Amino acid sequence: MEETHAIWIEKYRPRVLEDIIGQQEIIERLRSYVAKREMPHLLFTGNAGTGKTTAAVALAREFFGEDWQMNFRELNASDERGIDVVRNQIKQFARTSPFGGSTFKILFLDEADALTTDAQSALRRTMETYAQTCRFILSCNYSAKIIDPIQSRCAIYRFRPLGRQAVSEMVKRISADQNLTVTEEVIDAIFYVAQGDMRKAINALQGAAILGRDISPDMIFAITATARPEEIDDLIDLSLAGNFLGAGSSLQALLHDRGIAPQELISQLYRAVVKRDLPEAVKVRLIDSLGETDFRLSEGAGSDIQMQSLIAKFVMYGGRNSR
């Protein structure tokens, strides 16, 4: 296996816009900016691993060519959330002249939704003041956390979770380059684990590749500490059938023997419940219980008792439905 020490999410990160998999409508619009040699401020919003950072860097590469690193700067707002990062680092970059004859520079601010409201207000003023010399690309997971005055000054692009076809294409491309054997079942497992996040998909493949060239679904689930879909289904079946001891035993095996994080398990249970053919009243109660348990865990409650309580509620709701 070549370059086993390399981080694959960086090695296989697309360098130009046309190599980005998925988000085709967005990519076409970004390419039109390059063709016109002009662009507005941009706001990229969407889940992690959907291509926001990759698109921003590729756009800068195509705008500036060999000078792209001189005219592009990337900052992460979660590192410094306050107004000082705007007054110092951002303003200092925005006010300097572009390099190499370019008409503007690009500042990419990742996780912009982490900025405080005061910092965002200062950023809005900076965007207005230096619009002639600097274009801003803001990236966030939640656009609702970006103040309206900034949103109104940006062209907004919503990056959707990547579909199975996009994940499959990237997995097959990497597998061919790394001489790995993957089946459609393996791709299904990677897609289930990644949930539209290409970084997760590539990391899962690289983690499994350490164990051997012939990748199996079990390797994917093991390396990512994820329960198989059928294990989640079995846990729900036992609970709704009123088998509290059996469900509790399965729960303990997943949490302690397999090392699956409680909140990851809640996420998987939620996905399974949503897809299930259940009476609406039962589904509502189950999802409400999942949300309550997730909140309690985020507040620091003990995971074992909260997860057992969750299963107990599943058993109760299943029993009521059977009467």
UniProtKB/Swiss-Prot annotation:
Disulfide bonds: none
GO terms of biological process kind: DNA repair; DNA-templated DNA replication
Keywords on record: ATP-binding, DNA replication, Nucleotide-binding
InterPro entries named among the record's database cross-references: AAA+_ATPase, ATPase_AAA_core, DNA_pol3_clamp-load_cplx_C, DNA_Rep/Repair_Clamp_Loader, P-loop_NTPase, Rep_factor-C_ssu_arc, Rep_factorC_C, RFC_lid
Pfam families, sorted: AAA (PF00004), Rep_fac_C (PF08542)
Gene Ontology cellular-component terms listed: DNA replication factor C complex
GO MF annotations, alphabetized: ATP binding; ATP hydrolysis activity; DNA binding; DNA clamp loader activity
Entry's transmembrane regions: none
Entries under SUPFAM superfamilies matching the protein: P-loop containing nucleoside triphosphate hydrolases (SSF52540), post-AAA+ oligomerization domain-like (SSF48019)
Signal peptide: none
SMART domains, alphabetized: AAA
Entry binding sites for ATP: 46-53
HAMAP family linked to this entry: RfcS (MF_01509)
Subunit structure: Heteromultimer composed of small subunits (RfcS) and large subunits (RfcL).
Protein's job: Part of the RFC clamp loader complex which loads the PCNA sliding clamp onto DNA.
Homology family: Belongs to the activator 1 small subunits family. RfcS subfamily.
Protein name: Replication factor C small subunit
